[in-house]
Amino acid sequence: MSKIQIVFYSMYGHIHTMAEAVADGVRSVGGCSAELLQVPELISEEVLEKYGAKAARAAFAHIPTATVERLAEADAIIFGTPTRFGNMAAQMRNFLDQTGKLWLSGGLVGKVGSVFASTATQHGGQETTITSFHSTLLHHGMIIVGVPYTEQRLLTMDEISGGSPYGATTLAGGDGSRRPSENELAIARFQGAHVAKITARLTA
């Protein structure tokens, strides 16, 4: 059984919704399991409530918290993060910055790594967030997998949609009111399945 972790940070639920779709894609591939994990929050409960994020986060409060030690158990890790000024969220960066010991031991070398993201706007940094994230995965010796154009939904032109060859993305809107579209969720499911198929071959 190939073990695939989906490690994410979500403030308002957009990335959590995408993570569930990615997990569905993983589980559609025989011999592969999906485990959802969320990185620790850095923002106080008081501030989360002020920003209106506390209620949104309650919907996925049951998902276990990721630990650095747990990452080594996976055959592949698919990371999900919102964009913060063209980069990953601080919560994800903080978590990854604690993986020095794992890097030293080569614990992630040869494992598959993949990334999905969300932005507020159509050109809000979805691609730079993913490609800059790849630097960390390469330092860990991971094998990066994206979303090839065999996923025809990447070519959709009749609606505004996230998604790129670097990974699935969703557009949240400036006020966060837009939820992931079916096209975006389908690309996320494809990414999960694509990673699972490659991981299954590597671990056979």
UniProtKB/Swiss-Prot annotation:
Pfam families: FMN_red (PF03358)
Enzyme's top EC category: oxidoreductase
InterPro entries: Flavodoxin/NO_synth, Flavoprotein-like_sf, Flavoprotein_WrbA-like, FMN_Rdtase-like_dom, NQO
GO molecular function, one term: NADP binding
The protein, known as: NAD(P)H dehydrogenase (quinone)
Protein family (similarity comment): Belongs to the WrbA family.
Domain Flavodoxin-like: 4-195
UniProt-listed NCBIfam families: flav_wrbA (TIGR01755), PRK03767.1 (NF002999)
Disulfide bonds: none
Signal peptide: none
Membrane-crossing segments per the record: none
UniProt keywords, alphabetically: Flavoprotein, FMN, NAD, NADP, Nucleotide-binding, Oxidoreductase
One CC-aspect GO term: membrane
Cofactor requirements of the protein: FMN
Binding site for substrate: 103
Positions annotated to bind FMN: 10-15, 83-85, 118-124, 139
Catalytic activity, as annotated: a quinone + NADH + H(+) = a quinol + NAD(+); a quinone + NADPH + H(+) = a quinol + NADP(+)
Entry annotated with the keyword Transmembrane helix: no
Chain sites annotated for binding NAD(+): 12
EC number annotated for this UniProt entry: 1.6.5.2
Cofactor binding note from Swiss-Prot or TrEMBL: Binds 1 FMN per monomer.
